[in-house]
Amino acid sequence: MPYIEIRYSDISFDPKVQTFCHNPKFKCPNYGHSWACPPEAPYLEKVVSSFRKFYLVYYQFDLKSYVKQIKANHPKRKEEKILGSFYAKALMRDYLETELLSFIDEYQEDYEERLVLWDGYCRVCNNPKDKYCTYDSGKPCRYPDKKRYSMEAVGINVNDTVKNLQIELEWPPLNYAYRFGLVCFK
């Protein structure tokens, strides 16, 4: 399970990050449609600073191996098409969720409180029973204690945070793609 213990000072906060979800060039489809996304997501710099231990949990996906694997079954398929379909899949998100839940289960130290910042949008209500977030209906969040904020939704610049840790990201990803989550303990 890949994770790094980091310092609070490694975490790069910037309120402008919350505007990345909605600007003239891009609008995330979850912006304004989830209790855990901007504009509803709170800026959590002060809250996060009250915690004492921080772990960046991540999943690294080997894109080259993935392309080779797909090409073995579909030799005529172009690399661009393989990568395009990869980004549309929830594969990495599911892998990171597994890593985060494993890390939390295996964490042995005592703590009073825990804050987990996931990747992407909150998916707690994306299940057969609930089907969707209540945000658009105007009803309150069904599971306020289980709400999943992403690092970006609360104002963390993930790219700068990762750079602070000397992890090199490729844009666009050619060899490896990453997903990150942050687990904080008091």
Regions found by a protein language model. Give the residues of each.
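Auxiliary alpha/beta "docking" domains used to position bulky ligands
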Residues: M1-K186
